[in-house]
Amino acid sequence: MKVRTDFLCELNQKKIWLRREDLIKEKVTGNKFRKLKYNLIEAKKMNSKAILTFGGAFSNHLYATALLGYINGIKTYGIVRGNEWKEKLKENPTLINCVNNGMTLIFVSRDIYKKKNNCAFWRIIKLNPSKFYIIPEGGTNELAVKGCSEMLDKNDNIYDVLCCPVGTGGTISGLIKSSTINQKIIGFSVLNYNNLKSDIDKHTNKKKWELNN
């Protein structure tokens, strides 16, 4: 399918349009595909045997990683926040779809999950991180931003303001990087995360953007 932009309405003499990123690829929609696109290319380039990533029990990122890993013949591992879901797997369609697409799920408590950026985390779960191509929670890294920057092309220069929800900051960072000097980017944060603005600043030096909680 092809991404399209649909007219929604006119408000205060301003026309509002909706970018249909959900049409980009069957089953893996919008920014998830774009975030993983270049990470998968890099994993293959590095001859990685497996991808490991992180997410909550209803994480679209985990599902997208599992499906694209399956399609590309790369084994996937998902660290799931909340070890109670190990006993409730059948109640969770997201995790069931992950398993059905070949992902090995590793359930950890919320306290342990908070340590995922520390060396001690890997000792606790008894895995060697050097054995995996690791993608952070939510999928945001430089390669994800590169993929998300492809949302815009010269045909989008007609828009004055671009808005999007913001989780880990990858999508808005891509939009900021590929926006023109005359465009403003507005993000609406969906998470309670104090360092989000500084994380976005790491990916771009442009200043014509704002983040609303």
Feature map (PLM): residue ranges:
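PLP-dependent amino-acid enzyme catalytic core
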Residues: M1-N213
